[in-house]
Amino acid sequence: MTTAARPTFEPARGGRGKGESDLSQLSKQYSSRDLPSHTKIKYRQTTQDAPEEVRSRDFRRELEERERVAVRDKNRDRPTREHTSSVSKKPRLDQIPAANLDADDPLTDEDADEDSDEDSDDDTAALLAELEKIKKERAEEQVRKELEQKAEEERIRMENILSGNPLLNLTGPAAQSQASFKVKRRWDDDVVFKNCAKGVDEMKKRQDKRFVNDTLRSEFHKKFMEKYVK
């Protein structure tokens, strides 16, 4: 474990070391980490691409030799791969003409590759056609939904127009059409403090709606109790 991070509680002071009795002299103690390091230049060894070795080497010949070895290794492994591919890739009977069917004829890799290429091309074409069909169906569905939404919005707008105008809303029931032309009473017609600012003579004329400062004895309270409590 390193001791580099540990603090120095007792630093070295001159005159306190071994054989140091004069306090005026500086301390001769120093750390091993203060010693000079890497005092010698490191040169390339014999196996580390020294300049003398690089000058005497023929890199072109070495490259060509490595390429020949790689090609030889590749050709050595090819028969095994050809055998496995010929076994795994068998042509289908519906792709071979009837005149060429013979049990003694071996299946070559070229025929298998051509058949696999044709199969992959056919599969790709089928997938592209299916994708195009799906895109077309989605586009048609989107257009149909937009038309339905526009028709529904137009229908709602026309209904709002017809129902909002009482002169045009004459196609409903007779009672509703008759009631639509009748002026409705205000919601504050029978409140307690509606006509407080009017004169006393006017209030005396209306004995049924006389002003009473007690809410429990007012006409509004009586009507409310008779309507909702009794």
Curated annotation (Swiss-Prot):
Pfam families: Cwf_Cwc_15 (PF04889). It comes from the Eukaryota. Residues 121-165 form a coiled coil. Keywords: Coiled coil, mRNA processing, mRNA splicing, Nucleus, Spliceosome. One of its GO terms (cellular component) is catalytic step 2 spliceosome. Residues 22-34 have a biased composition (Polar residues). One of its GO terms (molecular function) is RNA binding. It is found in: Nucleus. Residues 1-126 are annotated as: Disordered. Residues 52-84 have a biased composition (Basic and acidic residues). Residues 102-124 have a biased composition (Acidic residues). One of its GO terms (biological process) is mRNA cis splicing, via spliceosome. PANTHER family: CELL CYCLE CONTROL PROTEIN CWF15, SPLICEOSOME-ASSOCIATED PROTEIN CWC15 HOMOLOG. Belongs to the CWC15 family. Involved in pre-mRNA splicing as component of the spliceosome. Identified in the spliceosome C complex. Component of the minor spliceosome, which splices U12-type introns. This is Protein CWC15 homolog B. It comes from Xenopus laevis (African clawed frog). The gene is cwc15-b.
